[in-house]
Regions:
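Intrinsically disordered, low-structural-confidence terminal and linker regions
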Residues: 1-69
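Long, contiguous, secondary-structure-rich segments that constitute the structural scaffold
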Residues: 54, 556-613, 676-687, 691-787
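Low-complexity, highly charged intrinsically disordered N-terminal segments
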Residues: 90-137, 147, 174
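Long, well-ordered, tryptophan-enriched scaffold segments
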Residues: 96-110, 119-120, 253, 267-368
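N-terminal leader/propeptide and maturation segments of large enzyme subunits in energy/redox metabolism
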Residues: 105, 109, 132-136, 287, ...
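Extended redox/cofactor-interaction regions of prokaryotic respiratory oxidoreductases
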Residues: 121, 179-246, 252-276, 396-525, ...
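Glycine-rich phosphate/diphosphate-binding loops that line cofactor/substrate pockets in enzymes
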Residues: 146-162, 217-226, 249-252, 338, ...
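Active-site phosphate/pyrophosphate-binding segments
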Residues: 304, 328-461
């Protein structure tokens, strides 16, 4: 899709630039900031029983934390070693010993006293286990017993009645691919992955806008572009090494713009531990913040476009790249008419930003020859998320910010190799190399040698709802096979999720650790299978980064705490398939990771090159340095598409707030610090604008209640620089306020934003009888979910 190859890592600017310093006072003394040196020493202490193996993981393996793709200590963006706390925090998952048997086989209610953080710290799952209906403890079983029980159950079920789910906690492309193939081999299309609750709208929107659901740019494009826009992203928190790229970009003249309801401290200033200058004096990251209200991004972008078209009336070519649009873009006149028809009053009301401020950014972008637009959960976790992303693409296309150096669209991924999950086919809407459509299905059937069922598989949220369907329904899910994941802490309406998980006949947890969902009952049995980490996978494996770099991570020897009964994830899937359909097992019987990579290169032509990755440091980038290079997109006519979208109605009443969930110091739902080191917020603190708190007569730190017709959240007010009538609570603690069944209309992502009421706890508790409070909230206040 692009002819230019990535140039490899570049050198950093050596001379200090004090204008980017936070303070001349060294080490951020007196500032609220992470304690990186202390945290690093703590990690070393935690891994002291397996320090050699931990060191080899860090120096030889590909990071299993975020999606930057650091291989060993190096990457393809900047020369020099890289290390971050995200990677260090997940390190212990690969080095720790097994859970002690007296804890593992304790009464289930004793295990349920642990939260997920405490369960994670107990150690790894040592061997296959089962807990049948009515049993109070997990019992050890053999692999044969476990796999036969799962296979025999599947043989009795309609394939529409079992499902697979994979989450990206270090899962390799090989495992994703085999899982996708095995699911279809067994006759089910119910397979989904963690991107369903993060970036599925990005893929959907980019496919319709530019023809490809992946980043069109690479990280080096940040460095030297005129403007780098972060939309709904706290990249410095989720992927700390990215701050090195930001610092280098600033030194080369890049202006960094952050668009987010909350002025995230980590995007304001950061101390980069692996850069001496930044570690000493800090780095001022963002040059400007635009605090758009939750759900107001589409209106905000319409304001930018509206001003561009007003600029064009006075001076043609002052805002729109007409040559690029004429040669490479469809739908210009339709979008122009639609944008000009938008009303400034509605734009300001929806976005929460004044016309004057919107015009500032519009003119900045209009003057910028180059720009990279990157975004994350702040744009994708909405019921209108696909439209959010298409609107970002509209901005880039109108300016011609696509398909060349220092330009592009970049969905900022948060999990290692989650980019590869869909590209390997572990998604109900895709198969390797393309969509789940007739043409691609027939192509893959020839590669795989068996027929693929034509019916549409379900997304994870619908699969959970299908568990509670009537017994006779053909899509009532009775067996759920999960590689990692904890739906109790990632999906809306945790009470319903717990009920659904308990109504499965058999639930399989293939994982390295226990979590709270593992301890939920099932109607027949809960089966737990010990998986190997990516560093233990025989022959190594690959992972795909945000920028489409496919890295080889070698098998790393010498684990003193080796889990002898753990198996590579892809091998477990192969074993299952052979037991369910032994008569055609030869079609799925991979023996090595190399065999899998050889087939991936055929099944997904973009991955032609993966078969040559064999040792540490091996890497290739599918699609070249820039997708849509020279404006030529992988669409039927080779042109990009401008998509007119509508400003969404959030359904908020005047007295309500809009609440969003946010991450603190955590990796996905795995929490590593109870207090956010960037802003001092505890897990049950509610970020609120001081002016809003004043109107509610609430003091900083005072107990408040956030409620709606779906749930109640009791916390404390935490004054923060957040947009008016917006609230922030931590994920997953705030998930009780989110109802099930509200999905993004194109990609099926759950909506993680909701309208709520806020009041002092003493007033709430005085007004509501505890026994009936949720019923009374719904009845007395007549609350309905937002549209």
């Amino acid at each position: 899709m692009g002819k230019t190859k990535h140039q490899g890592p570049i050198s950093t600017t050596k001379l200090p630039q004090p204008k980017h310093w936070v303070s001349p006072v060294p080490f951020g003394l007196g500032k609220v900031k992470p304690k990186h040196i202390r945290d690093t020493m703590k990690v070393a202490w935690e891994n002291k029983d397996n320090l050699g193996y931990a060191s080899r993981i860090l120096t030889q393996g590909v990071c299993d934390g975020c999606a930057l793709g650091v291989s060993g200590l190096y990457d393809q963006t900047l020369k020099g070693p890289h290390m971050c706390t995200t990677r260090l925090n997940v390190l212990r998952l690969s080095t720790m010993p097994a859970i002690k048997s007296e804890i593992l086989h304790a009464d289930i209610d004793e295990l349920r006293k642990y939260d997920s953080t405490e369960l994670r710290q107990l150690g790894r799952i040592p061997y296959p286990m089962i807990r049948r209906k009515g049993e109070r403890k997990f019992s050890r079983i053999t692999w044969d017993e476990a796999m036969d029980m799962i296979a025999n159950k599947m043989k009795k079920l309609n394939p529409k009645q079992y499902a697979f789910y994979l989450t990206s906690r270090g899962i390799t492309n090989e495992s994703y691919y085999v899982a996708a193939k095995v699911a279809r081999f067994l006759g089910t299309n119910h397979i989904d992955n963690a991107s369903r609750i993060c970036h599925s709208p990005s893929k959907t929107a980019m496919k319709r806008s530019v023809g490809v659901g992946a980043s069109t740019a690479n990280y080096q494009d940040w460095i030297g572009t005129d403007v780098l826009v972060f939309w709904g992203s706290v990249a410095s928190n989720s992927s700390p090494v990215s701050t090195k790229y930001m610092l280098e970009a600033k030194k080369r003249g890049t202006k960094i713009i952050v668009i987010n309801p909350h002025r995230e401290p980590a995007m304001d200033k950061y101390w980069i531990p692996s850069n001496l200058e930044s570690a000493l004096f800090g780095t001022k990251v963002a040059d400007d913040f635009y605090q758009v209200s939750i759900g107001g991004d589409i209106a905000f972008m319409f304001g930018i476009m509206k001003h561009w078209f007003e600029m064009e009336e006075n001076q043609p070519g002052s805002a729109i790249n007409h040559s690029f649009v004429k040669e490479h873009v469809n739908g210009y006149e339709e979008l122009k008419t639609h944008a000009k028809a938008q009303n400034w009053d509605e734009i300001e009301k929806s976005s929460g930003v004044t016309k004057e401020r919107i015009i500032e950014l519009a003119e900045t972008l209009a003057k910028s020859k180059n720009a990279v637009y990157t975004w994350a959960m702040g744009l994708t976790m909405h019921s209108f998320a696909t439209d959010n992303i298409s609107q970002v693409a509209n901005l880039a296309l109108l300016r011609g910010h696509l398909g060349r150096k220092h330009n592009g669209l970049m969905p900022f991924r948060g999990h290692s190799s989650v980019q590869g999950s869909g590209e390997m086919g572990a998604d109900p809407f895709v198969l390797p190399g393309g969509e789940f459509d007739e043409k691609n299905r027939e192509r893959i059937e020839k590669v795989w040698g068996f027929e693929i069922q034509k019916w549409q598989g379900d997304i994870v949220g619908v699969t959970l709802e299908n568990i509670v369907l009537p017994e006779e329904h053909e899509r009532k899910v009775k067996l759920y096979y999960m590689s990692g994941g904890n739906f109790l802490e990632t999906m809306p309406d945790p009470d319903f999720v717990k009920k659904a998980l308990s109504e499965l006949d058999i639930r399989v947890h293939q994982d390295i650790i226990l979590n709270t969902s593992t301890l939920v009952d099932a109607k027949e049995a809960v089966i737990v299978l010990p998986a190997k980490t990516r560093y233990e996978q025989e022959g190594g494996g690959t992972s795909t980064s945000t920028e489409r770099m496919v890295y080889f991570s070698p098998e790393i020897q010498g684990n003193k705490n080796e889990i002898k009964e753990a198996r590579a994830e892809w091998k477990i899937y192969v074993d299952l398939a052979k037991r369910v359909k032994p008569e055609t097992a030869h079609l799925i019987d991979f023996k090595t990771g190399q065999e899998i990579r050889d087939e991936i290169a055929i099944a997904n032509p973009n991955y032609n090159g993966i078969q040559h990755l064999k040792k540490k440091g091996d890497v290739f980038q599918w699609g070249g340095a820039w997708l849509c290079e020279d404006g030529i997109c992988p669409t039927p006519d080779g042109r990009a598409n401008l998509i007119p979208v509508e400003i969404p109605d959030f359904g908020k009443k005047e007295e309500q707030f809009v609440l969003t969930t946010r991450r603190g110091k955590q990796f996905n739902s795995m929490i590593y610090k109870e207090v956010d080191p960037f802003n001092g917020a505890g897990r049950y603190d509610v970020l609120i604008n001081p002016e809003d708190a004043k109107e509610l007569r609430v003091a900083d730190g005072e107990a408040i209640v956030v409620h709606n017709g779906f749930g109640v959240f009791q916390g404390k007010a935490k004054f923060a620089d957040i947009a008016r009538k917006n609230l922030g609570v931590h994920f997953p603690e705030g998930n009780f306020l989110l109802p099930r069944g509200r999905y993004e209309k194109y990609a099926g992502i759950p909506d993680y934003n909701i309208a709520v009421y806020v009041e002092k706890a003493e007033r709430f508790n005085a007004r509501k009888d505890t026994q009936y409070q949720e019923k009374e909230i719904a009845d007395d206040l007549d609350i309905s979910p937002p549209a």
